[in-house]
Amino acid sequence: MSSFKKILGLSSKSHKKSKKMGLPPPYDESCPMETQPSAPLSNDFFGMEDMDLYDKDSLRYEKFRFMLKMTVRSNKPFRSYDDVTAAVSQWDNSYIGMVGKRPFYKIIAVIGSSHLQATPAVLADLNQPEYYATLTGRCFLPHRLGLIPPMFNVQETFRKPFNIGLYKGTLDFTFTVSDDESNEKVPHVWDYMNPKYQSQIQQEGLKFGLILSKKATGTWVLDQLSPFK
């Protein structure tokens, strides 16, 4: 039997797949897309028979729960919020995770960065400052991204280095985003932004690849994701 397995190229060690829905792939296994779609989506394609296809003018509202734990370690103290977002925006470089949740993670990362607090200097490792933030909440997001796939209650963790100008260090983020099917009223997601930086939402969001516009009512809408971030 063992020789038969060798002929077929089968390993004697089996890798069991998780039967739980919504679990992300292991982040140390890269599965790059070697080709990109070159034709418009059609209801004739497999699995799209009854799908409500993307319409850039269609405004949708997504209601969800979220949790974020964020730790940023830097070689030197940040001088401004602009420095903070320049570093934090690097968190999803070479992104491997749930694609449908990525826009929501980006928004939560922007909001989380506005709440970062430095640890006491005496606790800083080798005099290198550490910043942290923890957020939980329920909210809604107006967007024009088309149909969003179901978001299961699954935790994803990302650890990335950054090297921006004078600053270099590491980013450790843990996200949980899931659909909120309750009938309770919830605030707009940007209401969680630190009031001190509310006026910078559009500008800072762009660093994370978020293209935002404001409705006549003053509500922020996520129009699209930048292809350059």
UniProtKB/Swiss-Prot annotation:
GO terms for cellular component: host cell cytoplasm; host cell nuclear membrane; membrane; viral envelope. A motif (dynamin binding) lies at residues 2-4. Gene3D superfamilies: VSV matrix protein. Residues 1-35 are annotated as: Disordered. A motif (PPXY motif) lies at residues 24-27. It is a peripheral membrane protein. It is found in: Virion; Host endomembrane system; Host nucleus membrane; Host nucleus. The keyword Phosphoprotein applies. It comes from the Viruses. Keywords: Apoptosis, Eukaryotic host gene expression shutoff by virus, Host cytoplasm, Host gene expression shutoff by virus, Host membrane, Host mRNA suppression by virus, Host nucleus, Host-virus interaction, Inhibition of host mRNA nuclear export by virus, Membrane, Phosphoprotein, Viral budding, Viral budding via the host ESCRT complexes, Viral matrix protein, Viral release from host cell, Virion. Phosphorylated by host. The keyword Iron does not apply. Residues 1-12 have a biased composition (Low complexity). SUPFAM superfamilies: VSV matrix protein. One of its GO terms (biological process) is viral budding via host ESCRT complex. Changing M51R: Complete loss of cytopathicity. Its main location: virion. Changing M48R: Partial loss of cytopathicity. Late-budding domains (L domains) are short sequence motifs essential for viral particle budding. They recruit proteins of the host ESCRT machinery (Endosomal Sorting Complex Required for Transport) or ESCRT-associated proteins. M contains two overlapping L domains: a PPXY motif which interacts with the WW domain 3 of NEDD4 and a PTAP/PSAP motif, which interacts with the UEV domain of TSG101. Homomultimer. Interacts with viral nucleocapsid; this interaction contributes to the virion assembly. Interacts with the viral envelope glycoprotein; this interaction contributes to the virion assembly. Interacts with host RAE1-NUP98 complex. Interacts with host NEDD4 and TSG101. Interacts with host dynamin. Interacts with host NDUFAF4; the interaction inhibits viral propagation and is independent of interferon activation. Interacts with host GTF2H5; the interaction may inhibit host transcription. Belongs to the vesiculoviruses matrix protein family. Forms a double layer around the helical nucleocapsid, the inner matrix layer binding to the N helix and the outer matrix layer binding to the envelope glycoprotein. Plays a major role in assembly and budding of virion, by recruiting cellular partners of the ESCRT complexes that play a key role in releasing the budding particle from the host membrane. Condensates the ribonucleocapsid core during virus assembly. This is Matrix protein. The lineage of its organism: Viruses, Riboviria, Orthornavirae, Negarnaviricota, Haploviricotina.
